[in-house]
Amino acid sequence: MPRAVLVVDDNEFIRRALCRSFTLEADFRVCGEAENGKEAIEKAQKSLPSVIVMDLSMPVMNGIDAARVLKTLMPGVPLIIFSEYADASSENEARLAGISALVSKSAHISVLLEKVRRLWGPIAA
């Protein structure tokens, strides 16, 4: 059974590209999209994702603030920040908020896909 991914990014082009990338992989399915942290919290509670991939810098509520709330509501769901702001300071703040991993948007999409796979582990056959 494919892992359910919630994709969160305020940039529609990036959000759609991420959704397409996950959809093309047999071991993932996109269970929802959101354009900010507040919307991510609402959609996560309805769609019950296996993993959340989220931007750091978004309007309304950023990825760090959303992660703090999501970790309280869904402590077992891995949260991955996919952001252009992937420096040491951002990574430290993200880890303190409960983020499982931080991947730079400048990395190839395969880096993100592999990170999600490693965090969640293999799918039982």
Where does each model-flagged region fall?
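Active-site beta3 strand of CheY-like receiver
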Residues: S47-V53
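Receiver (REC) domain active-site loop signature in two-component systems and cognate sites
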Residues: M58
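Conserved acidic segment of CheY-like receiver
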Residues: P2-I14, L18-F22
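Alpha4 helix (beta4-alpha4-beta5 surface) of REC/receiver domains from two-component response regulators
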Residues: D65, A86-V103, A107-E114, R118
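Short hydrophobic/Thr-rich beta-strand motif most characteristic of the beta2 strand and flanking loop
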Residues: D27-E35, K43
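Acidic catalytic/metal-coordinating carboxylates
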Residues: N36-E39, N62-D65
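Conserved sequence signature across two-component system core domains
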Residues: V8-D9, A34, I52
